[in-house]
Amino acid sequence: MLVARSGCSRTLIRMGNDENLMVMVDVEEGEIPDSVNTEIEVKHKSTTTTADVGGDVDVGVVAGGRGGGGGGSNGNSRVWTMEELISQYPAYRPYANSGLSNLAWARAVQNKPFNEGLVMDYEPRESDKIVIEDSDDEKEEGELEEGEIDLVDNASDDNLVEKDTESVVLISADKVEDDRILKERDLEKKVKLIRGVLESTSLVEAQTGFEGVCSRILGALESLRELVSDNDDFPKRDTLVQLSFASLQTINYVFCSMNNISKERNKETMSRLLTLVNDHFSQFLSFNQKNEIETMNQDLSRSAIAVFAGTSSEENVNQMTQPSNGDSFLAKKLTSESTHRGAAYLRSRLPMLPLLDLHKDHDADSLPSPTRETTPSLPVNGRHTMVRPGFPVGRESQTTEGAKVYSYESDARKAVSTYQQKFGLNSVFKTDDLPSPTPSGEPNDGNGDVGGEVSSSVVKSSNPGSHLIYGQDVPLPSNFNSRSMPVANSVSSTVPPHHLSIHAISAPTASDQTVKPSAKSRDPRLRLAKPDAANVTIYSYSSGDARNLSKVELSADLVNPRKQKAADEFLIDGPAWKRQKSDTDAPKAAGTGGWLEDTESSGLLKLESKPRLIENGVTSMTSSVMPTSAVSVSQKVRTASTDTASLQSLLKDIAVNPTMLLNLLKMGERQKVPEKAIQKPMDPRRAAQLPGSSVQPGVSTPLSIPASNALAANSLNSGVLQDSSQNAPAAESGSIRMKPRDPRRILHGSTLQRTDSSMEKQTKVNDPSTLGTLTMKGKAEDLETPPQLDPRQNISQNGTSKMKISGELLSGKTPDFSTQFTKNLKSIADMVVVSQQLGNPPASMHSVQLKTERDVKHNPSNPNAQDEDVSVSAASVTAAAGPTRSMNSWGDVEHLFEGYDDIQRVAIQRERVRRLEEQNKMFASQKLSLVLDIDHTLLNSAKFNEVESRHEEILRKKEEQDREKPYRHLFRFLHMGMWTKLRPGIWNFLEKASKLYELHLYTMGNKLYATEMAKLLDPKGVLFNGRVISKGDDGDPLDGDERVPKSKDLEGVMGMESSVVIIDDSVRVWPQHKMNLIAVERYLYFPCSRRQFGLLGPSLLELDRDEVPEEGTLASSLAVIEKIHQNFFSHTSLDEVDVRNILASEQRKILAGCRIVFSRIIPVGEAKPHLHPLWQTAEQFGAVCTTQVDEHVTHVVTNSLGTDKVNWALTRGRFVVHPGWVEASAFLYQRANENLYAINP
């Protein structure tokens, strides 16, 4: 019943928005007007009513003046529910919300909640009208007075309610069915959209547009999360979850291949993806998939920790406040989730690392250095941590290892406010002790760093469980000088070797060692004010201590060879007074990389019995083969006897340690400058021709090295020789002094070499310093003397005599280790065989046999040459045949050796000769070399545990059917636990290719896997003939592509590189031989193999399809290698033909004449679009790529329609193709059909 409010004499009653429903009614205050007998009737033409979803009807009837029974209203009255009133007439809602008795009564009768009726939608209809009729008649029987309720049952009303109820029930059932159908359609539509996004994720697209792909996947996963939460189970749920996991694998693969900058930019997105999948879909994943996600999270956390540790304090502060901004940003984005789904997810929970120490006073020496690598963020063991005085050390910090993980604060303000409570203490991380920005002039600054630089590592205490108090120095040993110690920090024999090798440091023995001396003592200007500070104390070592020290020093060199380089250069420069040494105060620069020092420490030379020469802090031998260039007096020296094979072992060690050679090379270059100021040096390239050009192979040449008796006595008594720099103060003043890291050193070094060359050219050929004495024993013949050599040096031309080389040394003069000698030490090591005799000085001469393969070939007819001796002066052995071998041996291939030293040239030449012999044999049989990759090229393998049970049954049936065929393709290896499927057409390919090529099998798997596959493909052993190469170890997985990617090379492959063809599915594993490679499409038969490479969609096994043998990949590859073979042997001169040129020519024919423009493939504004893989592939196969359309463009390669370039191509009838068209053309070595890859509008 609608009643006008009291207090209104004339009230405008308007219900709904229909203008026809507005009438004027006169009412008295507080009552329904009797004079005008107003009744409200509801007239409608429809006989049905609208009910809510539940089918319930409110029985509250709007009563009229006659109870709805008179006035022609029979049949037109309807039952009004509160839902209809609320939805149809908004003005009525306040009354319903206030708890109107009609609504309360209706709900009480039906035992329903009050608020259930507020959710019904009502559609307004034209037929529903409210008409107010005025009547002058008196009140009829049954008419209600004000405040009364009609309790008399009206039969007509009851019948009306009963009919309406039945109608509502029928309509409600139909509506429920419609809603169910709509819900199913909506669900199916959402599933289809999600699946489309997940299936469209490809590896190439992720590499080109990582952020866009991640955004789409985030949106799809959010929608999938809602579906999973709203529906307990729905079709395709498991499929969508598996697709989500496959997409995550693809994204993770691309993320792991990024550089550090890209990882830092995309780590948030990656973390959100991992968290979303792990939190909401892990219950639908298998155990292995969960483990893989956990591994992804751990890798991401480790990379995040490393990035956090390397950031500056300001960056860390920004990262601390970032979650706060992220929360506010998230709150805004939650309201517009439909426009940007990915932004509504929570940020990743990365561990927060401490910033710079809040209590530490940082000075210039403790700030990070831009020239040093970032200090490691990994914590040290609690036993060696540093604590601040006054703060307790917890038991947990003393016993636990690993990074200290702080709980993540979800509230940004709370996280910032509690920061000082967390990180107020000194951190347990090693980064507390920050490195110095510049290299210290005092190598021993407390950190024991190798190379004269300040290390960021904390010195481990020799007392387990003890803590070093930061800011307090520990007492040093009495014999320890923090400012005058040598670079490698002389180590006492009591220091455990492992204690030093762990940190690549060496320090004096003490129960606790100093952390860092005062900053004042590290001032480099103090060295100028106190020249005596450069003196250092030499410690005595036993042979065992020397060996242990060598191990520590070598490990330090391996840790940071860059520091070693700086240290050596630092010791070389400087004035003479700074490098003065006395007999009792001679430096022992242990571990500076000198080859003599290292070999002696390893036991080849004894310290007690071998006199040493000190030159700029680096030790050398008094009995060196290389004397100075100013030798004029021949004197004999009694040298201490050593083991018979010491020199041979020494040279071999030199050959395998290039660091030693590099250090000696630098020393020789630096020493030549002051010496040439007062002496005329002998041209090392002239003297180098003696052993390289005149000593023939198979010749044993005893090399005696006599030295001065006085020199021997001096060295035996004191063990130290005076530095040659003391005898040349004038030359020292002319040397250029530069800091160790001064980049002008490189320019200066090249200037010295050019100056040396010009000076050597001006040297007279009859200089007395270049003369030597020659004596012959046995048969003597004249050698061919180069024009540069003194004609008075009577040397045998055929080189079949032995040479006895007498070393001539000046007393107190250090031998000149020239550049050419150090560059050719490996050549000498290959030619030298040492035999020493103990006894008198004449019997203790060093016998050196010089051998070369070239000389063996030139003089095979002199078997008695070993009985002949030739002695020449030591000045003629200053260099070991390097330049002469380059000029006389390399010949027309000299250009191939540019950039290699003579050590590498010898090895390359030896390998080259061997390969040329193999190649000539192949050419004689009209064959080339063919390298075949196994995995995903010739076959596809899968382990038993990777194959699903439903696929297992299919494979078993196929294998039974395959056994009846003459050539099988499917195998089940029980002993290896794996399935193997051969690529269609492989038997025909191997049979025909073996007639044209020497076949080689190559795999990244282990030997067991390679052997089994070779037996499978070549049961008789006639195709490969044992040429099987495996790069993996025994502990590696069977399928090599699951391992960490490695590179492949042609080691073990017959012939030269110019005659080798490679067939592989991966280009990146052949970085040095891409020009020899025929790239083929991966053969992925098993579903697990597709997932390994992040590919979506069903596999060949699931599709029950396979490649066509006559048109597949192997058939196309066979046609290519047959063409290469035909073109190769059509040339008359096979030595000038290269398969790489033939292959490149065949590739350029594939897409010749095509002009390609890429649309939505290469990011807009890319500075170097030609580096995109598709761009490079298209140009490699003959196409011309451009960034702008023109009339010559023939193809537009795109992923979608709608761009200007695509519209331009469609209007002009040009090809609009998918990127797969380029890939297909490259794989099949023929232009693919554009219609198969067309993108139609």
UniProtKB/Swiss-Prot annotation:
Example GO BP: defense response
Region (Disordered): 361-402, 428-470, 505-525, 578-598, 677-702, 720-800, 852-885
Cofactor note: Binds Mg(2+), Co(2+) or Mn(2+).
UniProt catalytic activity: O-phospho-L-seryl-[protein] + H2O = L-seryl-[protein] + phosphate; O-phospho-L-threonyl-[protein] + H2O = L-threonyl-[protein] + phosphate
Cofactor(s) listed: Mg(2+); Co(2+); Mn(2+)
Segments of skewed composition (Basic and acidic residues): 677-686
UniProt biased composition (Low complexity): 441-466, 871-881
Domain BRCT: 1146-1239
A Pfam family per the record: NIF
A cellular-component GO term for this protein: nucleus
Stated induction or repression of this protein's expression: By NaCl.
Domain FCP1 homology: 923-1103
Hydrolase recorded as keyword: yes
Segments of skewed composition (Polar residues): 368-378, 691-702, 791-800
Phenotype upon gene inactivation: Grows more slowly and flower earlier than wild-type plants. ABA hyperactivation of stress-inducible genes.
GO molecular function, one term: RNA polymerase II CTD heptapeptide repeat phosphatase activity
Domain of life: Eukaryota
Main location: nucleus
Location(s), subcellular: Nucleus
EC number: 3.1.3.16
Domain notes: The BRCT domain is required for interaction with RAP74.
PANTHER family given in the database record: RNA POLYMERASE II C-TERMINAL DOMAIN PHOSPHATASE-LIKE 3, RNA POLYMERASE II CTD PHOSPHATASE
Record text on subunit structure and interactions: Interacts with RAP74.
Function: Completely dephosphorylates 'Ser-2', and partially 'Ser-5' and 'Ser-7' of the heptad repeats YSPTSPS in the C-terminal domain (CTD) of the largest RNA polymerase II subunit (RPB1). Involved in defense response. Acts as a negative regulator of immune gene expression and immunity to pathogen infections. Preferentially dephosphorylates 'Ser-2' of RNA polymerase II CTD. This counterregulates the MAP kinase (MAPK) or cyclin-dependent kinase C (CDKC)-mediated phosphorylation of CTD in response to pathogens and upon perception of microbe-associated molecular patterns (MAMPs).
Protein name, UniProt field: RNA polymerase II C-terminal domain phosphatase-like 3
Organism from which the protein derives: Arabidopsis thaliana (Mouse-ear cress)
Organismal lineage: Eukaryota, Viridiplantae, Streptophyta, Embryophyta, Tracheophyta
